[in-house]
Structures are given as structure tokens and as C-alpha cells.
């Protein structure tokens, strides 16, 4: 048993991350975490927010692990263009990392990709390439948060028929 916090865990106050880390440590199970758009440090309105403080406090933002027959990939999909504006998706460097990571995973394994902003909108950067990679596996699931409601979304067959589980964020 384990948990994954899919972001928006500090409500615009990244200085709370140390306390969040301590709290997650009391869960009695391993809990992994990703940053949401409300967890990145804001310098000012012009400078794009980044996850450096999240990495310092919580650990890497792009990583993977195996639990039984499941390969879990966690990635930061929040791309800030200023201190207030952001989009979602994966950079070319992240896509290369994902491709390399999955090259070691047998095709019969289940893969779960965890990130913050749902990919169902169709505008996420490198979304088609990510879905194509995941479609090569016997079973793949997408796990997101960001919204303030729960939704299950099945991508079209053209998108690999991937199942996106969208969980309401705890804050934001």
C-alpha cells in the first residue's frame, strides 16, 4: 500500500512544504508527492515559478518506482511562463527522460503516470507523444488532480484509449 499526493498541497505557501512532509511521514505508508500549480515558489509576477524549493524540501519532481507488477511514474506537468500564468504538459527533456525510463519496463507491466493537471483538455505539451508511449503497455492509467471535483475520463482510441483518473485537489 502507498499513496501519491498529486499536488496543490500548500495553497500558494511553499514554505509549508516542510510541515506537509512531516505530516505525510505519519501516514503509516510510503507517500510520494508531486508539485501542483499552487506549490511552486513565486518570486514576482514576471519570473516563471519553478519547483526548486519543492525539490529541496520534498525530493525529485520526475521519478519512477516499481510496486509489485506496477511501474509508477511521477512527473511535474505544470509549466509556468510567468509568476502567474501556466500551462501543462511535459518538456522535451521530460519526454526524453520518460522514454528512457520506460525502455526498461516490460510491455506486459501496468504503468501508472501521475501528474497534476489533467491531460484530457488536449492542449498539454507533448501529450500525443506521452500517450503513444503509454499505449504500448498492456495496461496504463493516468492519475491527475488540479480540479476541485472527481472525474474518470477515457481517451479516444486515437489517444490509446487511456483511462485518466482525475482526483479533486485538496487545496488551491
Predicted regions and their residues:
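Short acidic, glycine-rich surface-loop motifs adjacent to enzyme active sites
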Residues: 6, 102-122
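Extended active-site neighborhood of metal-dependent phosphoesterases/phosphodiesterases
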Residues: 14-107, 126-141, 149-172
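Active-site glycine-centered loops adjacent to acidic/histidine catalytic or metal-binding residues
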Residues: 7-8, 36-37, 116, 145-146
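Histidine-centered catalytic micro-motifs
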Residues: 113-118, 140-150
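N-terminal active-site segment of His-dependent metallophosphoesterases
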Residues: 1-18
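Conserved short-loop catalytic and cofactor-binding motifs
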Residues: 8, 83-86, 118
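Charged active-site motifs of nucleotide-sugar-dependent glycosyltransferases
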Residues: 2, 71, 110-111
